[in-house]
Amino acid sequence: SYCFSKYKSTNGWGTWKRAWKNMDMEMKWRNSSYENSIMANMGYRGSDIKYWKYKLKIIDNAYASAWDWQWYYTLSAQNQLSIFPKYSLVSNIGFGQGATHTTNRKVPSYYHTNKEIEFPLQHPPYIVPFITFEKAFYQQNNSMFYTLMRYIPFDIKRFVKRLIR
């Protein structure tokens, strides 16, 4: 019915109160002896660390008005996993012109359909990342388009968005 993953997503997300108690908006772990370990825990490849260091610069310069990246770092710092259901359980209406952060018009394919959860739940036998899911998730989120977009400075992206609107 679901799997565990090292990867994170806040689209259609939910959490437990005990996990949220660890939320570290200030990211107090930075410049500590744990920083490299936490960064390494964000992904599986060296390029992932480079990407997440870039996200830190965006946060430091207040280019993003979001909390989700800090949440991702919190999960990494606490070595917590995410749970992904077999099927999307929500219809995400947070895309498009009225959206706060995701103003792109193209809604990702995994939000097109949703299903109700099926009972009884089929639980994974172990609480470890499910590698098959993680490979697919990584490939989907690291397509050529997304990879190129990462290297375009945020100011330019914001300028282009304003022109398009």
Labelled PLM ranges:
Residues S1-R165:
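An acidic/histidine-cluster motif and surrounding catalytic segment
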